[in-house]
A protein has these predicted regions:
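Intrinsically disordered, low-complexity segments enriched in small/polar residues
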Residues: 1-232
Length: 232
């Protein structure tokens, strides 16, 4: 199972400014879409922050509607790791049953499927998504949601996680918050394949984290990071 490490650096002279502004390091991951819709981790910044994780996921269900700024409260969830290439039934007892194979079409490896078998009379619509655990400066952040999608009774959600990590600073939202879009400048760290370790450093002139050496030397032209900032 692949494991990844992301190191985020902030210059000591910039850190007090970031903290005074109430900014937090924010991470998100896309699932079955071009951009993320849930804040995975919201982290109090330090001069060096290390995040590590494995490509293992769980599936959760919530009664919280998919709306901007809503905080996800999980009704039920599977263990991590859930089995990819399989499907899980969310039963009328509001628990997950699975994994199960087969189905038409079958679930591809690397994807996860949840079927909403709760009666419409009980819950007309529920929210499903994936969860993932990370270690932040050696402290566990367990089973945090990374995605959210509305699923009507009798319907299903097919979820395919990606390995890219979106990184930015913001002050409005905490972990497990649904967002309709990422506002402001952000970076995308491109993990996957042979890339399992990336170091980024905050560039206050661009307002984003850019590629850097482990010693903090900026590398603006690295192919490992996509910068989304108007001045770049």
């Amino acid at each position: 199972m692949p494991s990844y490490r992301l190191q985020l650096l902030i210059d000591p002279k910039d850190l007090p400014i970031v903290k005074t502004a109430g900014q937090r390091i924010t991470l998100a991951k896309p699932v079955s879409a071009a951009s993320p819709n849930v804040i995975w981790q919201s982290i109090d910044p330090f001069t060096s922050t290390e995040i590590s994780w494995e490509e293992q996921y769980g599936i959760y269900c919530s009664t919280v509607a998919v709306s901007d700024g809503a905080t996800i409260t999980k009704m039920s969830e599977t263990e991590i790791p859930a089995q990819d290439g399989s499907y899980y039934s969310f039963t009328p007892a509001t628990v997950f049953n699975g994994p199960m194979s087969g189905g038409s079409p079958p679930v591809a490896r690397g994807s996860y499927k949840a079927i909403n078998d709760v009666p419409y009379s009980a819950y007309p619509v529920l929210t499903f998504g994936l969860t993932q655990t990370a270690m932040i400066n050696q402290q566990p952040a367990d089973r945090k949601p990374i995605s959210a999608t509305s699923v009507l009774a009798t319907q299903s959600a097919l979820m395919t996680p990606f390995t890219n990590i979106y990184v930015w600073l913001q002050s409005n939202f905490k972990s497990e918050t649904i967002i309709t879009q990422i506002t402001g400048n952000h970076s995308v760290a491109k993990f996957g394949g042979a890339v399992d370790n990336i170091t980024l450093k905050y560039d206050p002139n661009l307002g984003v984290f850019v590629s850097a050496t482990p010693k903090g030397v900026l590398e603006h032209d690295s192919g490992l990071v996509q910068i989304n900032a108007p001045l770049f």
